[in-house]
């Protein structure tokens, strides 16, 4: 970074990059523990979204307007909110550069900007998304279009896609399939619809325990699975999508498939300012110790949420646990004490297999099952639907973003 191009500087103590679930939740938890902390949050967006409900919006089970609030209404009191984007990180000198050329110096840095949806990596997608039957529940603007198109469809060919991992909420691509098929089944038109799920990977779900119960629903809805099939191009007006298909020998061929409805999940990458920084791992994500969530080379830096280069599921449930780990470990570091807490990789994916029933998949590193409740986690339950559709959204706005920590029991360092 060249000093001569920098604008006015901001001197800060604790700096948090990102005002999403991880950023706001962490700041609220830090202030609960130590109300006099000097915290600066850098977040350009004027709105805050509850993204886990967008799958429900696409299935006609949630009002999209209830998934967004003004950022100012969720920003904890007493925080210095800098409404700008970060364009560079210089951890060797403890400073950031912003989109308006200002610089921010810090003593401790928390990296939690989320990830970037790389729509542009699929040729033709940005031009046609939200029209011609091309949609995505990964977008606030288009989740309602999903439901509109699902209701209108009475027959034809439907393609659902899932890109290469990692992505946020790895179960969301198939949730779109299940809720759509459930609607068509109830409407009596499912037999007129050819449903195909194209996955860039070779497994329906990353934790093998949950594959058999999910396969029962794939079979119930008569959906066809196309593994190692990666969406690379879309022509909306021509109702055609192209996939790169890899065979057992690793040979890739491109195949065109027509559709009446296409639900796309875009590739997902780290924001450029992280991927280009010294904080990044080889894949561009923020490198951290998988248990302490502290950067291995810059001890004053922690990360949490989707940006982490850890193998856990990128979900809000993971963030709920990570918040406590980072809050406790950061405060211990500032007091020059050993870091007390370790993260076990917990993540949760409430798989909405039909309207009114959810398979609640909870697991940690290496796919270890970590159920919260003493029930068979592979059984679809109405109670889990209530948790997903009613309790968790309420707790998000009224608990998690206000520093209230629920079901966050964690392991302490031996």
Can you describe what each PLM-predicted range is?
Residues 2-80, 164-208:
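Beta1-alpha1 glycine-rich phosphate/pyrophosphate-binding loop at the start
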Residues 19, 100, 113-114, 245, ...:
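Glycine-rich, N-terminal phosphate-binding loop of Rossmann-like dinucleotide-binding domains
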Residues 126-154, 258-321:
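FAD-site-proximal beta/loop scaffold in flavoenzymes
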Residues 1-12, 80-188, 252, 263:
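FAD-binding core/adjacent interface of flavoenzyme oxidoreductases
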Residues 304-353:
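A conserved FAD-binding loop/helix module that cradles the flavin
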Residues 36, 79-89, 93-96, 104, ...:
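A Rossmann-like FAD-binding core segment of flavoenzymes
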Residues 2, 360-414:
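C-terminal auxiliary extensions adjacent to catalytic cores
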